[in-house]
Amino acid sequence: MAGNATMTHLVLGIDPEPLGMAPFIMATRLYPEVLAADLGLAGIVHPRARAVVFPAFGAYVGGDITAGLLASGMDRDARVRLFVDIGTNCEIVLGNRDWLLATAAPAGPAFEGAAIRCGMRAADGAIEVVTMT
């Protein structure tokens, strides 16, 4: 299971309140082993199947980012790479197999156009073309 720290805390029954106020401390970064059935997967998987819960980097860089880094192979690559996850929040990780730097910031205001003076909000026509090279 991979999710942000708040969602993971809620699913596992861990109090998420400390995540909502400074200094944004997680109760734990390594989650307990759980049965998949306890996560609502009874009848879908074997009754004794264990669920793997990906650990979080911190309060705003959760297990979903850990899972993404592992899936992308960034943790095994000698080249410096950039991993970006844009949603309500934006998490960015820069690094390679030897080091990783992670940060997070709210992305909603950027898409909503809050207090913009130039350009436009995220709407039809905001992006004219995207080229991958």
Task: Kindly give the residue locations of the regions a language model identified.
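Glycine-rich phosphate-binding loop of actin/hexokinase-like ATP-binding domains
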Residues: P18-E33, A67, D77-T133
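Short glycine-rich phosphate-binding loop at a beta-alpha junction
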Residues: M1-N4
